[in-house]
Every structure is written in structure tokens, then in C-alpha cells.
Amino acid sequence: MNALRGWLAALGSMLLASAAQLGMRWGMSRLPLPEAWAGQTPERAALLAVALAVAAYAASLLCWLAALRHLPLGRAYSLLSASYALVYLLAASLPAFDETFSTSKILGVGLVVLGVLTVNARRTAAAPAHHPSRKAP
């Protein structure tokens, strides 16, 4: 059950971090450049999107801490890599982001997904490896 909690927390962290990236991109693309902040009134929706994205990052961090409690770092961290693929696919699919698909980017996303699957593939039952910090019985 603890492993399931870890996987759910890692998935939550990945989804929240991805939403945060998209929200920040959308909001920041609608705000004026910092040097123009004094002379312009920022768009409220853009400010709200950035604020919600920061909150999503905070929630993502809490999920990440829960994931680390229950999963090995190597497995949990690979799911964060999947968020890069998810952000690209969503940004290229949604018209609000004006991103495009390309063969090289799709190949890169495929490699990231393949890496995540490889890291998280179940190992066959083998003799447990000796760990140098553990004493033999």
C-alpha cells in the first residue's frame, strides 16, 4: 500500500508541476515586460494564472515529499522527467500556447517516455544484490 501511495504522490507531483509550467507560460506571455510594469495595468487573468501556477508548484512539492517517503529516488525522479514530455505535448496540442509539433521534438518525447518505462520496468526475480553498507547474516 505504501508503494501505491508513493506512485500516486509522484503522479500528482508530475501533473501539478506540468500544470504550473503551462499556467506560468500562459500568464507570463500576457503580462508586460518588467520594465513596463510601472506604466501598465497588468491583465488580471494573467496575474491569476501565474499565482495559481505558483500554488500548483507548492502543492507539487508537497506531493513530491510524500513520494520520496514511499519510493526509491530513481523511480520517483523518472516520473518528473515525464512531465517534460507532458508539457510539450499539451503546449503543442492546445491553441493557447502557439507551439508546434516537430519530428525531432516528438522523437525526444518518445525517448523520455522510453527512459521512464525502462527505469520503472519490473525486474525479474533474482538473487538480492549485496549492499556494502549491510552486514551479512
Swiss-Prot record:
Heterodimer of ArnE and ArnF. Keywords: Cell inner membrane, Cell membrane, Lipid A biosynthesis, Lipid biosynthesis, Lipid metabolism, Lipopolysaccharide biosynthesis, Membrane, Transmembrane, Transmembrane helix, Transport. This is Probable 4-amino-4-deoxy-L-arabinose-phosphoundecaprenol flippase subunit ArnF. Pathway: Bacterial outer membrane biogenesis; lipopolysaccharide biosynthesis. The gene is arnF. It is a multi-pass membrane protein. The chain crosses the membrane at residues 4-24, 45-65, 77-97, 101-121. Gene3D superfamilies: 1.10.3730.20. One of its GO terms (biological process) is lipopolysaccharide biosynthetic process. The keyword Lyase does not apply. Translocates 4-amino-4-deoxy-L-arabinose-phosphoundecaprenol (alpha-L-Ara4N-phosphoundecaprenol) from the cytoplasmic to the periplasmic side of the inner membrane. It is found in: Cell inner membrane. InterPro entries: Flippase_ArnF, Small_drug/metabolite_transptr. GO terms for molecular function: carbohydrate derivative transmembrane transporter activity.
